[in-house]
Amino acid sequence: MNEFRERYMSRPTTLLELLAVGLDAEPAIGAPGSTDLTHAGLRSAVAETAAALRAGGLTPADRVAIILPNGPEMAVVFLAVASTATAAPLNPGYKPEEVEFYLTDLGARALIVHDGGDSPAAEVARRLGVAVLPLRPTPEVGAGRFVLDTRALAGPPSDGLPGADDTALVLHTSGTTSRPKIVPLSQRNLAASAANIRASLALTKADRGLNIMPLFHIHGLIAAVLAPLSAGGSVVCTQGFNALRFFGQMEAARPTWYTAVPTMHQAILGRARQNAAVIAACPLRFIRSSSASLPPQVLAELEAAFGAPVVEAYGMTEAAHQMACNPLPPGARKPGSVGLAAGPRVAILDDAGEVAAPGAIGEIVIRGDNVTAGYENNPKANAEAFTNGWFR
């Protein structure tokens, strides 16, 4: 096991390899009011769930939609599904017609929902012929543990494990100006992005994150969950962001860092002064901000309030989240800047689609192990998005 762990600590290519890094007895998944799930316990939960899904006939190519509240169960289910099939987490706030669109567009074979009676999402899934798999949390066993009812799956059993280039996760783009595009991300994409973030933030097994990000979004899934686990560290999964509860959660979890979007940081900052004692008792190593530009004044006020550096990063779904990141001290951080290339290769293309000379003005493009191979069933979008192997 030690040789296996050392081999993949620097660059795993699948989620199972990534999850092999953590030491057995060290914490992996936590939750307010629950006993931590160790890395050995996490691997066991992932293996048990994956085996049940394969016994029901699911293959790496099968899409499993997940509609669950934020929390440790959502994190573990995502890891289990993505380790054996293709995970498709959806917003629990979707209306029935939205659920129908996404289940149909994805070609979902199964839907995992909370075991609490017939939810509208479950009713939609059954009408579409999608197997509904109810999940019952068992927090008394440990954070993130659950019982999953897979009887609706119809076999025959599958024994295939995904390879590095098999799809692990599918997410939709926002679709604010057009039909949402499906972004498939491979095992390699996810593992590479987690490793990139781990390196940018110098994460180790001593680091403990506090997740307040939604786990149907690339930011929360990769930066908040996968990155710390890839370092053998841990993440405490809250039920979602609530500024009134944040400092209580921080005091209970005693994290070394958290990642959030600017609006969350601003809400946290608004309550920082009255929670100065918690901040002093629970010092953070750094704070991470991504998914939108953080106003320089907010960055400065956060650093003053927490006595910790704020690291801005730039990401997008097609890059499995992170593309660029400001360095930790003593590196120079520039407020309002996306920072330095942090994983993928970044270049500037000229009007002819060739890499431009230093100092030239052009279009920013990226390529690397974390970048999607292309949108699903959308040749027009792919032709527009890719130039000579670069993603625009």
For each predicted feature, which ranges?
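Short beta-strand->loop structural element characteristic of the AMP-binding/adenylate-forming
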Residues: A65-I67, M74, F78, A82-I112, ...
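Gly/Ser/Thr-rich phosphate-binding loop
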Residues: P255-A260, L269-R333, R345-A347, A352
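Conserved pre-ATP/AMP-binding loop-to-beta segment of ANL
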Residues: A25, P139-V141, R145-F146, L153-H172, ...
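Conserved AMP-binding/adenylate-forming core of the ANL superfamily
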Residues: R7, P27-G71, A75-L79, K95-E100, ...
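Conserved AMP-binding A3 loop
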Residues: D36-A40, A168-A192
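Structural core segment of the AMP-binding/adenylate-forming
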Residues: A55-G56, A85-L161
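Conserved AMP-binding/adenylation subdomain of ANL enzymes
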Residues: A82, A191-R208, I218-T256, A267, ...
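Conserved ATP-binding/catalytic segment of the ANL
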Residues: A341, A357-G359, V365-R392
